[in-house]
Amino acid sequence: MKLFGFGSRRGQTAQGSIDHVYTGSGYRIRDSELQKIHRAAVKGDAAEVERCLARRSGDLDALDKQHRTALHLACTSGHVQVVTLLVNRKCQIDVCDKENRTPLIQAVHCQEEACAVILLEHGANPNLKDIYGNTALHYAVYSESTSLAEKLLSHGAHIEALDKDNNTPLLFAIICKKEKMVEFLLKKKASSHAVDRLRRSALMLAVYYDSPGIVNILLKQNIDVFAQDMCGRDAEDYAISHHLTKIQQQILEHKKKILKKEKSDVGSSDESAVSIFHELRVDSLPASDDKDLNVATKQCVPEKVSEPLPGSSHEKGNRIVNGQGEGPPAKHPSLKPSTEVEDPAVKGAVQRKNVQTLRAEQALPVASEEEQERHERSEKKQPQVKEGNNTNKSEKIQLSENICDSTSSAAAGRLTQQRKIGKTYPQQFPKKLKEEHDRCTLKQENEEKTNVNMLYKKNREELERKEKQYKKEVEAKQLEPTVQSLEMKSKTARNTPNWDFHNHEEMKGLMDENCILKADIAILRQEICTMKNDNLEKENKYLKDIKIVKETNAALEKYIKLNEEMITETAFRYQQELNDLKAENTRLNAELLKEKESKKRLEADIESYQSRLAAAISKHSESVKTERNLKLALERTRDVSVQVEMSSAISKVKAENEFLTEQLSETQIKFNALKDKFRKTRDSLRKKSLALETVQNDLSQTQQQTQEMKEMYQNAEAKVNNSTGKWNCVEERICHLQRENAWLVQQLDDVHQKEDHKEIVTNIQRGFIESGKKDLVLEEKSKKLMNECDHLKESLFQYEREKTEGVVSIKEDKYFQTSRKTI
């Protein structure tokens, strides 16, 4: 008998409520919680991290207020350079934060594949779990990153790791509807036989979350279709309860394939049973979620009804009474055997049932009157026994209902307790998913309760039907004395010799009625026997159901114990957190008291400052008044002094004005004289410029003459040189002649020649001296002209300077005149 079931929540998926945090999200970073190295790691500044480590090597594994290291923050932000720097410095790779997450889990969680690969290559442990029981592989499954999952598995990640809900990565991929991850994990030989805490298989979860693609993948993997959960439901039951006809059709086709394979191994006798099973299974799909009551026997044992044979009615009646029908046993047309077989493991159950019914038909004891009387005595006792059995059964059903109610109420209480604490199932993908999970479990428990109520109603209907059958038995027993009285009448009528034709007809009618009544009695007895057999079978079935209920109860008790242990663990953890919070609260209260005292002190200071400020304000107002008075007095004195100064200044200005007017007249006279001088100097300058031009012309002519004289002088020097050479030759000749001729004659000739030559030389020298004198004269003239030119330039410069001074003096005169006019 099934006590629990899941409701018809159709395809509730975790995917809708998961799209929140992992867009990631990472950490909530507050600047006040971080140290310098943590800030540098968040920004990805590897140089700053290196400087922090150079200053203080202890900052390598330093924790912030959330127990996070720089490696955690770098992996969350995806800064590969910082991660490589920290890993090369041999930091702690498997250090955990406040949620017991390692840097590897954080890198996989934030989908930072490069950081995760670096950590795995440096020996990070991929099998560590956070406080929610999730490993890095669970987070890779959630983010649907096959490359990350493959790297985790290649570095030794456990493919069958369990979270706190006993979900393996494969089951978690099915819950999140990650079809690619399911295919990937199955290729990596993940176990398709894994079950969660409620003993639900992968196929059941795929059906529950309405994933036909995943169902098809699992069926291709030859998953066990007949596996049952804690409540005895299989995958097809989930499809029926959620009204998923497509998935149900897939599962039925897969079952047919399995049964076809088994048909080849089983004989021809089993083939008929299997076909009956499939016809009944398809035709009579259960309306509720109760699978254990699907094996509901609606069969009745065929009754023996003797067909009337040719002969006397008396013989017919005796034969019917003795139960010796000569014809073949005829089954009641309205009572046909119908059996619903649910579990394919119970193959051939239909045949065994048919054999049992045939044996029951053959073993009906209706042989003699003694046997009938013995049977009647047992039947008289039977209603009481039946009523006792019915009461026991109803008590058992009521007990099972109470157990179910208590378990469901206990589960609901536990869930409300957990909600009061703040968490239900603490798997964070994210909190909304857990809330959905809790709502799902509560709804499932409510539906289980409704299923138990439906089961109880069905059992009550069966009991009412049995009561009606017992009433029929009582009516049959009430008819037996009338039949016996009729038989006695017929015997007496036979014994009396004086009976007439009318009595004979009456007896004949009575015999016919007697035969009919006996036939009815035989039918009723057969029904009673069949009901007894049915009741025995049902008792056995109910005993089995009670055993199943006990087993489920034991399993539920274990589950409750596990939940209680988990609750105690969570309560202990929450107690520790509460103690920490209390300590922090006391610390904060102490700080608050200190702040209050400081606030009081500050208030007293503020009051004193306010009094001082009021005094200062009054003083300030008085000082302002005095300052105004002083300003007024100062302004008055200033006005007086200004008036005095103005009067003195005006007198001075007047005197200066008179003096300036005198100077102006003098300057005008000087200006006129300068004008005359300017005109005269201009005329003289013109004359001098003309003389300068003539001098320049003369100078150029003299220069030409000097050049010509130089050329002539050079020619004369050349001639003198030639003459001196000739003279030397002449002297040599004279000497030679003197030697040859007479010294005296030669001497006279030589003297005459010398005198002639001397005159020529003296003439040349005189000419040269005269030309030199002329050159000197010309140079003196040029010097004089240059001096005159310089003098003229100086006079021009003085004239221009005097001119500018005169312009300035004119402007000053104009200014003084304008100032006089204004005054």
Swiss-Prot record:
SUPFAM superfamilies: Ankyrin repeat. ANK repeats lie at residues 66-95, 99-128, 132-161, 165-194, 198-227. InterPro entries: Ankyrin_repeat_domain, Ankyrin_rpt, Ankyrin_rpt-contain_sf, CC144C-like_CC_dom. PROSITE patterns: ANK_REP_REGION, ANK_REPEAT. Transmembrane segments: none annotated. Residues 301-343, 355-402 are annotated as: Disordered. It holds the Pfam family CCDC144C. Residues 431-480, 565-724, 776-805 form a coiled coil. PANTHER family: ANKYRIN REPEAT DOMAIN 36-RELATED, ANKYRIN REPEAT DOMAIN-CONTAINING PROTEIN 20A1-RELATED. This is Ankyrin repeat domain-containing protein 20A1. The gene is ANKRD20A1.
